[in-house]
């Protein structure tokens, strides 16, 4: 939703239904056993941002994502295990230099610093800090 004051609110919801019997190719797997989709059944996302919240050149963005716990089964390549159940919050502030058509941004991904995996037996993902400089002739 784009509000009259410039605030933008967006949400996203993903639902994955496990339909039928999904059987992974594994020589040692018991015949007839089923595995999950290796994806969370429910995922949620909420974003709030305002590119010109203060003084018409200072903005912010906050995004929260939640992934429900799920059973990850990729025994052939990565293994099996429980993933998800993590809340990630990303934040960003921005500053527009109107005279130079430049947008400066600084932010933190995974503000809470809770390490998480997107696959089993892989390195965990932590926080990322970033600074960007965008030049665009349309920034005024």
Where are these regions (language model features)?
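Gram-negative outer-membrane beta-barrel transporters
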Residues: 1-72
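C-terminal beta-signal and adjacent terminal beta-strands/loops
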Residues: 6-9, 65-74, 82-84, 88, ...
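Flexible, surface-exposed loop regions and adjacent strand-edge segments
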Residues: 15-19, 25-32, 77-81, 120-128
């Amino acid at each position: 939703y784009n509000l009259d004051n410039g605030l933008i609110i967006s949400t996203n919801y993903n639902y994955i239904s496990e339909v039928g019997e999904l059987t992974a190719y594994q020589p040692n797997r018991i015949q007839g056993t089923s595995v999950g989709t290796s994806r969370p059944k429910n995922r949620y996302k909420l974003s709030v941002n305002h590119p010109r919240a203060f003084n018409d050149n200072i903005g912010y963005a906050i995004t929260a994502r939640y992934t429900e716990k799920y059973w990850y089964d990729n025994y052939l390549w990565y293994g099996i295990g429980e993933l998800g159940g993590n809340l990630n919050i990303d934040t960003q502030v921005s500053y527009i230099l109107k005279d130079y058509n430049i947008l400066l941004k600084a932010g933190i991904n995974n503000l809470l610093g809770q390490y998480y995996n997107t696959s089993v037996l892989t390195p965990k993902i932590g926080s990322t800090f970033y600074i960007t400089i965008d030049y665009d002739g349309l920034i005024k």
